[in-house]
Every structure is written in structure tokens, then in C-alpha cells.
Amino acid sequence: MPTVGDLLLESLRIQAEAEEACLDFIRTDLELCLTFARVAETAYGMGHLEHADQAVARAEKGYSDMLRFFSKAKRLTPGIEQELQSEFKELRDRLDRVQRLG
């Protein structure tokens, strides 16, 4: 029969795994948003404005969704927080550049 200490340790392990999964989700979605931004750049360059606008809208939605997840993330190390802030900035800068094309 597990002790209270065992249950606490298991709870902490599960919580840490969930937090890591959340960070992985944020990183993956930010990369997907960057892909949408690159697709939009290409589409604008080819004159496919509707396709470009759709790609930008998807990237913007992903950006705002991930900001919400990021704001709720707990126990971030300074390094991870800085890494994610840098990725958010890169995406925001890219989206701003792409939107000037449209």
C-alpha cells in the first residue's frame, strides 16, 4: 500500500510531466505558426491573397492561444522563459512583416 509520501511524489512527478508536455505543446505550436507565416509570405508573393490571409489568420490565432498557455505555465526556469519569449518575439516580428505584405 502506498504511503502518503509515495502519493505525493507520484503527484509531483505527474505534475512535472504535465508541465513539460505543456511547454512542448507551446514550442510545437509556435513552430507551426512560423510555418503558417512562411506560407503566407509565399502566397502573398505569388498573388494568392486569400490563401495568404487564411495562413496569417491561423498563425495569429495560434500566437494568441499560445500566449494564453504561456501565461498560465508554472515553474518556468529563467532559461526556458527567456527561450519562449524569444520564440514569441520572432513569431510576432514575422507576422508583423507578413501583414505589411498584404
Report the location of each language-model feature:
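Long, non-catalytic architectural segments outside compact domain cores
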Residues: 1-54, 61, 68, 72-102
